[in-house]
Amino acid sequence: QEDTENALKGVLEALRVGGTYKSKYGNKTFSSAAKNAASGAVIAIDAKNGDVLSMASYPNYNPNKFVNGISYEDYQALQPKNKNDVLAANPQVNLATQGVFQPGSTFKMVTGMAAIDNGLSPNYAIQDTGVIRLGGPKSRPFADLIWHKSRSNHGYTDLYKAIQESCNIYFYTIGSGKNYTGGKDPSVKVGAKGIIEYAKKFGLDDYTGLNEEIDERKGSVPNMAAKLETT
């Protein structure tokens, strides 16, 4: 637990200045500074059984200060600098269980599993180009991170490589059922409804069960009808 808390704090400190985080497990150098990286969370899980090994949120506070009555000064120090900013660092919010965030590339597991269960071979491959336009030449471009960083691409990519290198375009392809790089379309089309179905199967619309011991917020899987009503 102590290692997790120290690592989280150290990474954020290095990230804010674009420096190097050093640890006994290896070093990580950040190429640029992210001055607003003031908060974060880490959960370490046993990949074999799902047990939570450690959990940390930053910034945090010492709960012992509340035992005999916290001072006004100490209590004010626990308040977010801007109470109108929901993203402001807040020591009293456990981001690991109370923060609700977009899942980012971890969601690729949902899309991949939905495609596999519907018959896609993991050997299905595309020739990744780094960037595609889903709606034609004048539409908004969608790109891989490697494209944004170096105008490069992942090349020949099957599901295994797509997961290993987090290839965005591969998952756009198997999710939509159309190969926008010019090759053969995947044998299945999962579509939005299929992805939503599997997101719910993964429990992304439910509590984890930790809320019996720790205050928890649950995620929300998008609803197509609700999306149309708000756009």
Regions found by a protein language model. Name each.
Residues 1-38:
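Conserved, well-ordered alpha-helix/loop/beta-strand core segments that scaffold catalytic motifs
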Residues 34-35, 40-105, 110-231:
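Beta-lactam-recognizing serine transpeptidase/beta-lactamase-like catalytic domain environment
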